[in-house]
Amino acid sequence: MGPFLLKLLPAGHIFGSAMLHVISKTNGASLLYTGDFKLRESYTAETNALIPADTLIMETTFGKPNWIFPGLTEIEEQIKCFALEAFSVGHVPIFLCYSLGKSQELQAILGKAGIPSVSHRLVYEMTMACRRAGCKVASGVKFDGLVPDNHALILPPNSAKKMLPLIPNCKTAILSGWGLDARAIHRFGTNVSIPLSDHADFNELKEAVNQVRPKRIITVHGFTREFASELRRLKYEAWSLQGHDQLELDL
């Protein structure tokens, strides 16, 4: 495009998400803009494909060392146990997660565990759109007001206030990276929190920098100043887009 070569790369965030790699035709300088991304394995998102760049502009949603997520196997077990425990006492397990991305990942996890589910209309429509675009995830069943026995229900978080009073005998779980903090159940008003995230955690953010090998890094979104400070400690040139970086002194 004009004086630049543009390339889209899989971000690993959700199905179809992409990063942008830019090379100047004039001097060969390169830039990688990640947008939201993750490096962890996924059933529905394409595998992240980082490549080297001179400048890295990266999201740092979870850019502090206390944000390190469990592996996918452990997350799957938490989801399975929550659903089966709810079934065992005659309750409906309800998972609250975004309609696009996380809901499709959850459907894949539930399907692998042999747990059938019904989905809110918005979740169902997003899933069908992903399937039309090539995502290999089951279509699921659209919620019609009733949840069959031994079925889980998938709802967007912003529909919970309206929908939950209609579902007697239910248990709720929020699926969010912020669920790593035990206080998340109070923030989201759920029975449990499960830290299924479609963002890179602290270790993945550092690994992304290692793979890209940039000369300079700009952090955007989340703990931008904190992660930029961590990178400067590791001898990178790194700055928060928000500014007001606190410079470190070697004493």
What are the language-model segments listed below?
Residues 50, 64-145, 216-251:
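Binuclear metal-ion centers of metallo-dependent hydrolases, dominated by the metallo-beta-lactamase
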Residues 1-17, 23-25, 128-154:
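Metallo-beta-lactamase
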Residues 7, 21, 32, 94-96, ...:
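Conserved beta-strand elements of the Class I
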Residues 17, 41-43, 65-67, 104, ...:
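Short helix/loop capping segments that flank catalytic or ligand/cofactor-binding pockets
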Residues 112, 140-251:
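C-terminal regulatory/interaction regions
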Residues 14, 35-37, 60-62, 100, ...:
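Active-site metal-binding loops of divalent metal-dependent hydrolases
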Residues 1-94, 101:
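His/Asp/Glu-rich metal-coordinating catalytic cores
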Residues 13, 27-29, 102, 124, ...:
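Generic "edge-of-domain/loop-turn" microfeature
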